[in-house]
């Protein structure tokens, strides 16, 4: 099913590419767009994961600089029977995470610094189990290719606005109509991405993730915290084609389970996980248990100890005052964009 969905998606994206090329340069432009689309498809297959990780300045971590987080991913990977993915952290205050890679053998999972600061180890385990479920289902191939191609189509639409409309009436001129139509392609391509990546994959990943970590309430608690954080993600605002890759939509203003939303409504996902917890009897025998650091020693992510309070989801320990591994900041990537009034 994922292979067929990916093939259909690539065909749609290629057709859109060719259509914009025709509006810009007629038949010649269409053929050039076809060649570019073919090259883009191949490039996306091999390199889109690196492009997405680069867009968020994600940095790879290992057992030396992020021991607890890395061990959580390692333990969950063993539970799932998957190859060990590369593990990344990206500097962003919004609690969120995503997976990428063309197959389980070439996969990567990434968590934001905000996620590691806001969630308990059990909740982090629930989130990363969800991302590993995407890897297992090979959703990551579809997600990474669509993110790259949708962004490329948006750029081609902008190109049409500035350089289109110069063909003559014999097939070499479309006036201003062509560029105007091309300008519509960018949002339409984003809509196609949202439709092509079915929201049902999130429910499936939630369910499989709960099976991997062994406790659906860990993920339910994490989703509630992430949704309630209300932290902007300006990196995602600048790269909206990547929004569907995250565990919760990083963009503002999309809270309803509408036809074209990138994610199901969070409350619906939490309700499904609560029902699954009852079905599973709360916990499974093979539940994964993150290894907490000793209270007197450094905290799970690197420095301070946890505040020990139980929350209503059955997750031990509330949000902690721990710090996260230092991954190095590259400028102010998540600063609000500067406009003419500021």
Curated annotation (Swiss-Prot):
Positions of transmembrane segments: 6-26, 28-48, 145-165, 173-193
Stored Pfam families: Peptidase_M48
Residue numbers spanned by region Disordered: 290-342
Active site, per annotation: 131
Needed cofactors: Zn(2+)
Keyword Ribonucleoprotein: no
EC number annotated for this UniProt entry: 3.4.24.-
UniProt-listed GO biological process terms: proteolysis
Cofactor note: Binds 1 zinc ion per subunit.
GO CC term (a single one): plasma membrane
InterPro entries (UniProt xref): HtpX_protease, Pept_M48_protease_HtpX, Peptidase_M48
Highest taxon above the source species: Bacteria
Subcellular locations according to the entry: Cell inner membrane
Membrane topology (UniProt): Multi-pass membrane protein
Binding locations of Zn(2+): 130, 134, 202
Molecular-function GO term, any one: zinc ion binding
Keywords: Cell inner membrane, Cell membrane, Hydrolase, Membrane, Metal-binding, Metalloprotease, Protease, Transmembrane, Transmembrane helix, Zinc
NCBIfam families: PRK01345.1, PRK03001.1
Family to which the UniProt record says this protein belongs: Belongs to the peptidase M48B family.
Name of the protein in its database record: Protease HtpX homolog
Organism: Allorhizobium ampelinum (strain ATCC BAA-846 / DSM 112012 / S4) (Agrobacterium vitis (strain S4))
């Amino acid at each position: 099913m994922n292979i067929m969905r990916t093939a259909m998606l690539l065909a749609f994206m290629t057709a859109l590419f060719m259509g914009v090329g025709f509006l810009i340069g007629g038949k010649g432009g269409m053929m050039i767009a076809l060649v570019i689309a073919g090259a883009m498809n191949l490039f996306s297959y091999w390199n889109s994961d690196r492009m997405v990780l680069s867009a968020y300045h994600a940095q790879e971590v290992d057992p030396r600089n992020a021991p607890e987080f890395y061990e959580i991913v390692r333990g969950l990977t063993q539970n799932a029977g998957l190859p060990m993915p590369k593990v990344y952290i990206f500097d962003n205050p919004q609690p969120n995470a995503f997976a990428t890679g063309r197959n389980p053998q070439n996969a990567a999972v990434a968590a934001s610094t905000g996620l590691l600061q806001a969630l308990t180890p059990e909740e982090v385990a629930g989130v990363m189990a969800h991302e590993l479920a995407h890897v297992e289902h090979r959703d990551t191939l579809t997600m990474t290719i669509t993110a790259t191609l949708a962004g490329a189509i948006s750029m081609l639409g902008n190109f049409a606005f500035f350089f289109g409309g110069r063909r003559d009436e014999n097939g070499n001129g479309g006036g201003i109509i062509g560029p105007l139509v091309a300008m519509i392609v960018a949002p339409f391509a984003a809509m196609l991405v949202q439709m092509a990546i079915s929201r049902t994959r999130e429910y499936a990943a939630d369910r499989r993730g709960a099976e991997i970590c062994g406790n659906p309430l860990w993920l339910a608690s994490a989703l509630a915290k992430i949704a309630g954080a209300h932290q902007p993600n300006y990196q995602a605002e600048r790269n909206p084609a990547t929004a569907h890759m995250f565990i919760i939509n990083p963009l503002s203003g999309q809270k309803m389970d509408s036809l074209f939303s990138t994610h199901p409504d969070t409350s619906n996902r939490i309700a499904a996980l609560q029902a699954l917890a009852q079905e599973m009897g709360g916990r499974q025998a093979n539940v994964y248990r993150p290894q907490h650091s000793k209270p007197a020693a450094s905290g799970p992510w690197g420095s301070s100890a946890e505040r020990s309070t139980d929350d209503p989801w059955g997750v031990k320990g509330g949000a902690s005052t721990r710090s996260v591994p230092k991954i190095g900041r590259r400028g102010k990537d998540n600063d609000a964009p500067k406009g003419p009034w500021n």
